[in-house]
Amino acid sequence: MRACSRRPLAAVVAAALAAASCTIHQREQTAASLAGAPLGRSVCVLFMDGLSKAAFDHVLAAGAVPNLKREIVDRGLSYDTAVASVPSETYPNLGAMLTGLHPGHHGIPANIWLDRRLRLAESHTNIFRVHSAADFLVPDARTLYERLPRDSVAVTTPMGRGATVYAKNLVAVVASYARWDWEFLDRKTIDDVGDAYAGALDAGRIPSLAFAHLLGPDEVAHSDGPESAEFRAVLANIDRAFARLVRRLKRWRIYDRILFVLVGDHGNQSYTRTVEADELVHRALTSHPTEADCEAGNCVLVPASGPRQKTYDVGEAQIAVGAFRGAMIWLPASRPPADVPGAFAAGKRKKQKRPRGAPPPKIVMPATSDFAAALALAPEMGLVMTRGPVPGSVVVYGPRGRSEIVRDETGEGPPRYGYRVVAGEDPLGYASVPALAPFVSGAPFPADDWLFATAPTEYPDLAVQLPEFFDSPRAPDVYLSPKDGHGFRSGKAAGHGAVSRLEMVVPLVFAGPGIEPGRRPVARTADLAPTILAWLGVPFDANEMDGEDLRLLSAPLPPPPPLPPPPAGEPAEPQEPPGRER
């Protein structure tokens, strides 16, 4: 699109955004004036969509984010191995951070999922459906916003159920897609957070929670890769916008009341080799010719995108690729958990022509175990994971071996998890680590023991998280994680959704009142909700969450002093350069 043709659109968008900015200030001022007793402290979450720990460490070392380093990292508490939730996709992880529940328990197990009970297929990646995601949380899953005073703020995030002020910024999101200008959106998101603080301060309080969802890192990682100059530029832009927010908060004398949290939901892994998920399923089915015969006219042809433009017979399997590197498969013949009546019924499809008098075609899918074993032999595959024969068990298939995870819920206390290699080599590689010898014997160990023991490995915490993921009746029958360097969609530089370390380990840093700078070894991002509530002093029932309070404080915080008077106006901030265009 030529620059001159964008001017009318730019003018309309600018006017809409200016009005929205005023609205955020006014909405938060109104909400804060009506809320109950203030907490006197605040948590500001910088939710870095698509940022891995490895990528963040790289930009820190390169000096690309000096303000984040000075204001958060250098004076904060960092976790060396903060493990995201399985799968490494945005919606299940955002839900886990807001509710403290694993994706298998809060109702959104993936970006794209099927529900056999409701005969429902849901794609949260559809831009017209993104803000309906919270509708699918289970009734018992309460978000952070629902547990806090009525002064919380959520900006640009697709999941804001319970937030007092929810700025979806849909116009800005659409404009960013249209112009491919994510720097603009991330600047606006952080500036909106500042406007919300100003509005609350005008009412004599500060928001208990301000949640800024920064989309730029993930979108640019998909298009250019997390190692690219474009990716570093997006993070440098966030850094400058954050510096502007810090200046405003310090000027208003509320900076030292705020706990800053920098967290990622998943990483991104670059890939150069692409395979269609439909083709992989086709290969696995045709390795069982007596069970899925494509020559009898009973094939369901699924068009495959990409340069080859082939069609692949996938029987009645339902396949979803939510973030380019993880694939999920629902099999019609598979038996779902006992509380899920009936198998998933595929949607209506065009009937196949058959000779007069011929019997109706019938596809008989192979057993899940045979199907998964066939998939694991594909040269592109790293791991294939399925539900096990009993609830709470998972079978993991690799190219040269098979293992089993069993959750043990007997006795008192939280569940424990056992792991053993059933055949061949250990797919997760735990058996090759001498320190993990007790953990591969099949004996059950507590979840935290697994987290500490597997933190240095390629698959940290997987023995705990996979059984929890497959608890969901909406989880697939088969979950695919390809080898490094492979993805399921062409035209992308990087993706996520698999279980590799690069996709699962993210930055997690806390900086603010009562936080002693330093490092701790491990955490789960599902720990975020109880940790924030505990720091704010908001009571909660720990039994309602899978996550645990990370106990950031060595001593209780003293009561906060009275707030300063509202700001009497702000000096003009220096203008940012225009965002990059394509």
Can you name each region flagged by the protein language model?
Residues G382-G398, T454-A455, Y459, V538-P574, ...:
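Polar, surface-exposed loop/tail segments
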Residues A96, G100-S228, V234, R407, ...:
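His/Asp/Glu-rich, glycine-adjacent segments
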Residues H25-G40, K53-R147, P158, A163-V165, ...:
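Active-site nucleophile/metal-coordination loop of metallo-enzymes that catalyze phosphate/sulfate
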Residues P38-A54, E71-I72, M97, L148, ...:
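Beta-strand elements within well-structured catalytic alpha/beta cores of enzymes
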Residues E183-D202, P217-L259, N268-S270, A284-E295, ...:
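A long, amphipathic alpha-helix that forms part
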Residues G63, L77, P87-E89, N111-A133, ...:
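Secreted, luminal/periplasmic, and some membrane-associated catalytic domains
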Residues K483-R519:
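Low-complexity, glycine/alanine/valine/leucine- and proline-rich hydrophobic stretches
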